[in-house]
Design a protein with these regions (language model features):
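Glycine-rich loop at the start of a catalytic domain that most often binds anionic cofactors/ligands
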Residues: 118-122
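Alpha-helical scaffold segments in soluble metabolic enzymes
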Residues: 1-2, 85-88, 92, 115, ...
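Flexible inter-domain linker/hinge segments
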Residues: 1-51, 55
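Gly/Thr-rich phosphate-binding beta-strand-loop-beta motif of the actin/hexokinase/Hsp70
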Residues: 39-67, 71, 143-160
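Short glycine-rich, Thr/Ser-proximal phosphate-binding strand/loop in the N-terminal lobe
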Residues: 52-84, 88-92, 167-174
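Glycine-rich phosphate-binding loop of actin/hexokinase-like ATP-binding domains
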Residues: 1, 73-78, 124-174
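Flexible hinge/switch segments at interdomain interfaces of large molecular machines
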Residues: 63-64, 110-113
């Protein structure tokens, strides 16, 4: 008499992401090794390179030294106005920029790329998928997949032989 007097469940569940603490710790250690050096904008000098990601709901910004250290970062909602959000970051960075440092180049990507590039006369625009792939490859050489969960969609990039092989897009994310 299976289940007589007892509630039964037919709900299927996935196995836990990690079998035990040791597996979780190994994962954390492996991923902690993938880091980008950082520095302080106040002590930076020489050419700096600025990247903006003008997304549909947020704006992200990093300023990097010529050797790739992040000296400034910003992440915030854009209130539906990527140009206004970008202007706020411009003001923030310009006020903090030391006298012996200068912005040598700026690149923008994301949903608001064209608007921000035109409004702020940004040097270059980059297709978002290429920006994500290049960043992933810089952090983890030999990367084979990149997943981008954005405000408008979600993309899964597959990489083969150092080039984008395929892109799958879910057209409704948030």
């Amino acid at each position: 008499d299976a289940g007589a007097g007892q509630a039964t469940s037919l709900t299927a569940t996935l196995r836990p992401l990690f079998a035990d603490e040791a597996e979780r710790d190994a994962f954390a250690t492996r991923h902690a090794a993938e880091t980008i050096p950082t520095g302080d904008l106040a002590t930076a000098s020489g050419p700096l390179f600025w990247g903006l990601d003008a997304g549909s709901t947020t704006i992200k910004s990093v300023v990097m030294t010529a050797d790739g250290a992040i000296v400034h970062r910003h992440y915030a909602g854009n209130g539906g106005d990527p140009v206004k959000a970008a202007l706020g970051i411009v003001k923030e960075v310009r006020e903090a920029l030391p006298a012996d440092a200068y912005l040598a180049r700026c690149c923008v990507t994301g949903y608001g790329e064209g608007l921000v590039q035109a409004a702020l006369r940004v040097d270059q625009g980059e297709i978002e998928t290429m920006a994500h792939y290049r960043a992933a490859e810089a952090i983890a050489p030999g990367v084979t997949s990149v997943i981008d969960i954005g405000g408008q969609d979600m993309k899964c990039l597959r990489v083969r032989g150092g080039a984008l092989d395929s892109i799958a897009v879910n057209e409704a994310c948030s």
